[in-house]
């Protein structure tokens, strides 16, 4: 018995075209182009979710380093002193302190001064 793909194909096409909303021109309207663009888009999304973590970590390092240099020390010395002093503040929190609460950051820096 012959099986037609009418319903299955329509569902698949609808699913792809629904996900392709917001794309430009034929990449939104034509199934094949939409499917190709969607594949690429999903690849970019997957890759950049990993990249985002690296980008934010490097941003935090830059911010902490800038705050440390205002107090005549370097990022690497400061992080080593934190480890030696057994203070477990992560880079995200330290960068936030450096940006929004310099007084708190300075107090942390003063508390590890003896380990520098």
UniProtKB/Swiss-Prot annotation:
Binds directly to 23S ribosomal RNA and is necessary for the in vitro assembly process of the 50S ribosomal subunit. It is not involved in the protein synthesizing functions of that subunit. The keyword Ribonucleoprotein applies. This is Large ribosomal subunit protein bL20. Coiled coil: none annotated. PANTHER family: 39S RIBOSOMAL PROTEIN L20 (PTHR10986). HAMAP family: Ribosomal_bL20. InterPro entries: Ribosomal_bL20, RIBOSOMAL_L20_CS, Ribosomal_protein_bL20_C. Keywords: Ribonucleoprotein, Ribosomal protein, RNA-binding, rRNA-binding. The gene is rplT. One of its GO terms (biological process) is translation. SUPFAM superfamilies: Ribosomal protein L20. GO terms for cellular component: ribonucleoprotein complex; ribosome. The lineage of its organism: Bacteria, Pseudomonadati, Campylobacterota, Epsilonproteobacteria, Campylobacterales. It holds the Pfam family Ribosomal_L20. GO terms for molecular function: rRNA binding; structural constituent of ribosome. The keyword ATP-binding does not apply. Belongs to the bacterial ribosomal protein bL20 family.
């Amino acid at each position: 018995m012959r099986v037609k793909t009418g319903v299955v194909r329509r569902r698949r096409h609808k699913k792809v075209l629904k996900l392709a909303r917001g794309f430009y021109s034929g990449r939104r309207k034509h199934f094949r182009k939409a499917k190709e663009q969607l594949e690429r888009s999903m690849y970019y999304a997957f890759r950049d979710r990993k990249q985002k973590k690296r980008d934010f970590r490097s941003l935090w390092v830059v911010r902490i380093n800038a705050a440390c240099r205002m107090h005549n020390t370097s990022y690497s010395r400061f992080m080593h002193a934190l480890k030696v002093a057994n203070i477990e503040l992560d880079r995200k929190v330290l960068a936030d302190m450096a940006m929004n609460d310099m007084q708190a950051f300075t107090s942390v820096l003063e508390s590890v001064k003896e380990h520098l």
